[in-house]
Amino acid sequence: MRAVVQRVNSANVDVNGKIIGKIKKGLLVLLGVGKNDTESDAEYLVNKILNLRIFDDNKGKMNLSLLDIKGDILIVSQFTLYGDCRRGRRPSYSDSASPEKAKKLYEYFVEKIRKEYNIKVETGEFGAYMKVNLENDGPVTLLLDSKKVF
């Protein structure tokens, strides 16, 4: 499972001209599911993302997590995170999970956060064409992979 994690002052996701998810200060997470991913991959990334100390403390040092600041999280599915661009000019998505498997693990990821943590959780719409708007804070952008590829 892969994630692009961005620290934001605000973010929203629009489907067909309607904003369906909106957050203030927190994290925008673009989440991709790989064909070999399991619930343990989702659990690893939930724990990692929510506890990353990437928010400034009162001394300006990145020392606080999303949980510490009681920030919001916007989670958007993005299968293209598994695009392999090493050969040719068109990405191959053969390492992406099937839509059925990806949706199941995406929903598991989202529900784990909703049920176990007291933070605002917003989402995009799985499989839809979306417009994601954000105001980066920093910018701080991190790439995570549950298999620790990078």
Curated annotation (Swiss-Prot):
Coiled coil: none annotated. GO terms for molecular function: D-tyrosyl-tRNA(Tyr) deacylase activity; Gly-tRNA(Ala) deacylase activity; Ser(Gly)-tRNA(Ala) hydrolase activity; tRNA binding. A motif (Gly-cisPro motif, important for rejection of L-amino acids) lies at residues 138-139. Gene3D superfamilies: D-tyrosyl-tRNA(Tyr) deacylase (3.50.80.10). Homodimer. Belongs to the DTD family. This is D-aminoacyl-tRNA deacylase. It comes from Thermosipho melanesiensis (strain DSM 12029 / CIP 104789 / BI429). The gene is dtd.
